[in-house]
């Protein structure tokens, strides 16, 4: 079997999602050098894997789609032709946008849990505790996915 195809099928089996959606995580991970399992864990924590999820925040902003992209990112995403509707209706666009946002935090903070926490809570010092809680939530799910990867669950097709 061709290695990229094998990887895609394994990813789809682990995620228990269509190969198309698994491919979205794989493509975004490759493009931004982020483990696709980490992106999947973020989507699980953010939206419960609901591509139509929407959350209105107390500060007036909105979190949109599978990766719960905050509306404060919409002006920057508009430069790429991405609008709120795209994030709500196109799960792959949401995954790619989420990976881009996380990659920007990685550039600023390094590839670590501070960047993951900043994905949800930003970088303001008064949000340290919120960043840490969020990173712990993502880590808990990510660790389970890593364990399944190590245990060979990629081949079994079991749900993460």
Residues covered by each model-derived region:
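Positively charged n-region of N-terminal signal peptides that target proteins for export
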Residues: 1-6
């Amino acid at each position: 079997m061709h290695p990229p195809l094998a990887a895609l099928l394994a990813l789809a089996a682990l995620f228990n999602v269509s190969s198309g959606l698994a491919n979205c995580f794989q493509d975004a991970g490759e493009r931004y050098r982020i483990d696709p399992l980490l992106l999947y864990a973020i989507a699980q924590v953010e939206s419960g894997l609901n591509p139509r999820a929407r959350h209105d925040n107390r500060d007036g902003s909105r979190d949109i789609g599978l990766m719960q992209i905050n509306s404060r990112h919409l002006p920057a995403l508009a430069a790429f032709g991405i609008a709120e509707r795209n994030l709500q209706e196109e799960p792959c666009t949401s995954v790619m946008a989420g990976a881009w946002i996380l990659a920007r935090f990685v550039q600023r903070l390094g590839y670590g849990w501070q960047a993951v926490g900043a994905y949800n809570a930003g970088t303001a010092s008064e949000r340290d505790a919120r960043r840490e809680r969020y990173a712990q939530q993502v880590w808990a799910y990510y660790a389970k996915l890593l364990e399944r990867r190590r245990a060979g669950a990629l081949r079994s097709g079991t749900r993460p």
